[in-house]
C-alpha cells in the first residue's frame, strides 16, 4: 500500500485545510515538496481547492507553479480541470496522474476520454469528497459548491473510467485517526481501487493496510516532522 500526502494549492502557494472549509496559509510549494521528499513520501496529490468559481487565469498560474517544481516524487494533480482548454494547459506538466471530481459527477465522457487518450487509463483518478449526515452519504459537487446525494452519481461510470477512486472524508479533513470507515464500506468498489484521505493516522493506516486499499493520503500533518511519512510507514 502506498503512503502519500495531499497538498492544497491556492494562488501558487500551499494552504492548510480543516473540515473542508477553514483555510490557513502554509507556504511555498517547492519547500513543501522538498519536505515530503525528505520524508520519503510515496506520492503527492496536489489539489486546487476550487469551489463554484474559477478562472483560466488562476488555473494557468497554478499550473506554472507546478511546472517549476523540482522533485523525484510522483505527483497527481487535480482541481478545476473542467474543459478541454484546461486539459490542454497540462501538456508537459511533470505529473503522473490526473484527478477529476465534478467531471465524473456530470459524466463528462468527452473530457475524461481525452485525458485517458493523452495520459493512459492508469493515470485517471476520481476524487469524491464525502460527508455522512444522519447515516446518509453525500458528495461535495465542487462546480456548484454544494452537497448532493451519492445516489445521484453513476458509480458504474466512475468504476469504468477511473483507475482509482479517492475517497476524501471532508468531515475529518485535517484531523488524525478519524477517517470514517463507513465511507469505504458503503461503496461497491474493490478496496485495491480505493485511495483514502481525510483523518488519516497510524491506526487508520493499519486498518487500510490490512484491508488492502491502494493508498492513503495524509493531509496537512505530513509537513510536520512529528507526523512525518516515515512515522506512518512504520505503523
Enumerate the language-model features and the residues they cover.
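Hydrophobic faces of well-ordered beta-strands that scaffold small-molecule active sites
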Residues: 2-9, 44-46, 75-79, 98-100, ...
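Conserved anion-binding
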Residues: 8-22, 91, 95-173
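Short, acidic/polar
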Residues: 24-37, 83-89, 145-158, 205
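Glycine-rich, positively charged N-terminal anion/phosphate-binding segment
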Residues: 27-34, 54-66
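Catalytic domains of carbohydrate-active enzymes, especially glycoside hydrolases
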Residues: 32-47, 93, 158-165
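Glycine-rich phosphate-binding active-site loops on the catalytic face of alpha/beta enzymes
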Residues: 51, 88-89, 93-111, 166-174, ...
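Short loop-to-alpha-helix "cap/lid" segments that border enzyme active sites
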Residues: 63-64, 138-167, 177-195, 200-204
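Catalytic cores of alpha/beta
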Residues: 65-97, 181-216
Amino acid at each position: 500500500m502506498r503512503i502519500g500526502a495531499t497538498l492544497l494549492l491556492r494562488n501558487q502557494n500551499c494552504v492548510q485545510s480543516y473540515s473542508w472549509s477553514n483555510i490557513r496559509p502554509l507556504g511555498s510549494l517547492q519547500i513543501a515538496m522538498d519536505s515530503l521528499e525528505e520524508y520519503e513520501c510515496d506520492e503527492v496529490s496536489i489539489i486546487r481547492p476550487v469551489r463554484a468559481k474559477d478562472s483560466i487565469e488562476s488555473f494557468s498560474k497554478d499550473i506554472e507553479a507546478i511546472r517549476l517544481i523540482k522533485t523525484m516524487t510522483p505527483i497527481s494533480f487535480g482541481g478545476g480541470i473542467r474543459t478541454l482548454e484546461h486539459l490542454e494547459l497540462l501538456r508537459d506538466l511533470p505529473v503522473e496522474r490526473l484527478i477529476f471530481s465534478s467531471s465524473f459527477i456530470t459524466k463528462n465522457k468527452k473530457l475524461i476520454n481525452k485525458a485517458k487518450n493523452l495520459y493512459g487509463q492508469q493515470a485517471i483518478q476520481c476524487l469524491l469528497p464525502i460527508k455522512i449526515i444522519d447515516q446518509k452519504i453525500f458528495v461535495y459537487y465542487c462546480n456548484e459548491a454544494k452537497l448532493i446525494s451519492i445516489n445521484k452519481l453513476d458509480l458504474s461510470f466512475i468504476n469504468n473510467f477511473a483507475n482509482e477512486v479517492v475517497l476524501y472524508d471532508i468531515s475529518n479533513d485535517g484531523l488524525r485517526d478519524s477517517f470514517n470507515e463507513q465511507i469505504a464500506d458503503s461503496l461497491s468498489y474493490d478496496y485495491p481501487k480505493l485511495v483514502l484521505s481525510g483523518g488519516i493516522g497510524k491506526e487508520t493506516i493499519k486498518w487500510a493496510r490490512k484491508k488492502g486499499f491502494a493508498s492513503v493520503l495524509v493531509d496537512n500533518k505530513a509537513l510536520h516532522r512529528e507526523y512525518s511519512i516515515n512515522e506512518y510507514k512504520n505503523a
